């Protein structure tokens, strides 16, 4: 869920993809070139269908396209990930897509993000912190990039490490957040694709409980190696 937000403009999320299983939209993802989508490892399911160029779930765009995964790549062959590490998955589409009015890739970041940046996150996730209410069109919200400790301190039960390849983002006073169904979607800071929605509190958007995002910049070498055909590439330790 994107909470405390507004409906996205139909033209501002050409890179956003929707992951379906059967008829259920369960995660988002980001098109990074004509053949590859980046999302969260915990979004891995059997029989994924990928919709590109989608805005309304009820009224299709003329240029919507559907794909299925040709290959999936994880940091570890075991597909393991934790709350603080390796929640990232690369999906190779079964055939390339063409740019269109509502489809275009989002570039990988050229520099790391800075704490204090205003970031935008996008998704079709729940729009109520307590009710199973899902929107027809994706919602967008601006949140702040925070110190990692801001995500570590509120969750002592998770025993998160002192350092992490995870970004922390949210609004400390609460009210704005990603939520159930937004996993795998992008966090865009100062125009750059910096994070993949990973996990947060439930109920969402609670004060002093921001959410965590996989840090894309730290995984650039792995992403670029996999795309180049070096399928034995390893993620950063």
UniProtKB/Swiss-Prot annotation:
InterPro entries per UniProt: Peptidase_S1_PA, Peptidase_S1_PA_chymotrypsin, Peptidase_S1A, Serine_Proteases_S1, Trypsin_dom, TRYPSIN_HIS, TRYPSIN_SER
Role this protein plays: Thrombin-like enzyme that shows fibrinogenolytic activity against bovine fibrinogen alpha and beta chains, but not gamma chain. Hydrolyzes fibrin. Enhances ADP-induced human platelet aggregation. Has arginine esterase activity for TAMe (tosyl-arginine methyl ester) substrate. Reduces thrombin-induced thrombosis. Does not have hemorrhagic activity. Reduces the motility of human liver cancer HepG2 cells in a wound-healing assay.
Signal peptide from the UniProt entry: none
Protein name, UniProt field: Thrombin-like enzyme agkihpin-1
Taxonomy of the source species: Eukaryota, Metazoa, Chordata, Craniata, Vertebrata
Family (UniProt): Belongs to the peptidase S1 family. Snake venom subfamily.
Pfam family, one: Trypsin
Enzyme class: hydrolase
Coiled coil: none
An example molecular function term from Gene Ontology annotations: serine-type endopeptidase activity
Highest taxon listed in the record's lineage: Eukaryota
Predominant cellular place of this UniProt entry's protein: secreted
Swiss-Prot/TrEMBL keywords: Disulfide bond, Fibrinogenolytic toxin, Fibrinolytic toxin, Glycoprotein, Hemostasis impairing toxin, Hydrolase, Platelet aggregation activating toxin, Protease, Secreted, Serine protease, Toxin
SUPFAM superfamilies listed in its UniProt record: Trypsin-like serine proteases
Tissue-specific expression: Expressed by the venom gland.
Gene Ontology annotations of biological process type: proteolysis
């Amino acid at each position: 869920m994107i909470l405390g937000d507004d409906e996205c403009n139909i033209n501002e999320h050409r890179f956003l993809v929707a992951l379906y299983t059967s008829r259920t939209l369960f995660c988002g993802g980001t098109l990074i070139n004509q053949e590859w989508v980046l999302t969260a490892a915990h979004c891995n399911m059997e029989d994924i269908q990928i919709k590109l160029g989608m805005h309304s779930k009820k009224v299709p765009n003329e240029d919507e396209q559907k794909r299925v995964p040709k290959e999936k790549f994880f940091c570890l062959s075991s597909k393991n990930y934790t709350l603080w590490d390796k929640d990232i998955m690369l999906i190779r589409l079964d055939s390339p897509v063409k740019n269109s009015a509502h489809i275009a890739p989002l570039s990988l970041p050229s520099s790391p993000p800075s704490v204090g940046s205003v970031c935008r996150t996008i998704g079709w996730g729940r729009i109520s912190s307590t009710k199973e209410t899902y929107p027809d069109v994706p919602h967008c919200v601006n949140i702040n990039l925070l110190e990692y400790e801001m995500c570590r301190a509120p969750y002592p039960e998770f025993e998160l490490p002192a350092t992490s390849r995870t970004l922390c983002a949210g609004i400390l006073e609460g009210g704005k957040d990603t939520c159930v169904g937004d996993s795998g979607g992008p966090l865009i800071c100062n125009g750059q694709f910096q994070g993949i929605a990973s996990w947060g509190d439930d109920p969402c958007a609670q004060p002093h409980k921001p959410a965590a995002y996989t840090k894309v910049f730290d995984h650039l070498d792995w992403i670029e190696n996999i795309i180049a055909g070096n399928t034995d590439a390893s993620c950063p330790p």
